[in-house]
Amino acid sequence: MLYPSIDSLMDKLDSKYTLVTVSAKRARELKEDDQRGPLVGKPKSFKPVGVALEEIVEDHLQYERKEQ
């Protein structure tokens, strides 16, 4: 995968573990709910994980870290 780059993704989130968690949850949402499309206008990727990563890099997704 060339786009988005790992560097641009890491600028948006605080750790690679957060990146994996957020993108996996969003990809699952995209796969399960066909009525809601991607938040990006015209995604370059056809796979749900790729679309989720594009949404992260374009600031369409937000997450909230829960304090323990």
From Swiss-Prot:
User: Which keywords does this Swiss-Prot/TrEMBL entry list?
Assistant: DNA-directed RNA polymerase, Nucleotidyltransferase, Transcription, Transferase
Q: Does the keyword Repeat apply?
A: no
The family database entries (Gene3D superfamilies) matched by this protein are listed as: 3.90.940.10
Enumerate the catalysed reactions.
Answer: RNA(n) + a ribonucleoside 5'-triphosphate = RNA(n+1) + diphosphate
MF annotations from Gene Ontology: DNA binding; DNA-directed RNA polymerase activity
Among InterPro entries, the record links this protein to: DNA-dir_RNA_pol_omega, Pol_omega/Rpo6/RPB6, RPB6/omega-like_sf
Q: What is its biological role?
A: Promotes RNA polymerase assembly. Latches the N- and C-terminal regions of the beta' subunit thereby facilitating its interaction with the beta and alpha subunits.
Record GO cellular component, one term: DNA-directed RNA polymerase complex
Q: What is its EC number?
A: 2.7.7.6
Which residues are connected by disulfide bridges in this protein?
A: none
Similarity remark: Belongs to the RNA polymerase subunit omega family.
Q: Which SMART domains match?
A: RNA_pol_Rpb6
Tell me which species this is from: Halalkalibacterium halodurans (strain ATCC BAA-125 / DSM 18197 / FERM 7344 / JCM 9153 / C-125) (Bacillus halodurans)
The protein's enzyme class: transferase
Quaternary data: The RNAP catalytic core consists of 2 alpha, 1 beta, 1 beta' and 1 omega subunit. When a sigma factor is associated with the core the holoenzyme is formed, which can initiate transcription.
Top-level lineage group: Bacteria
Identify the Pfam families for this entry: RNA_pol_Rpb6
Q: Which gene is annotated as encoding this protein in its UniProt record?
A: rpoZ
What are the recorded Gene Ontology BP terms? Answer: DNA-templated transcription
Name by which UniProt lists this protein: DNA-directed RNA polymerase subunit omega
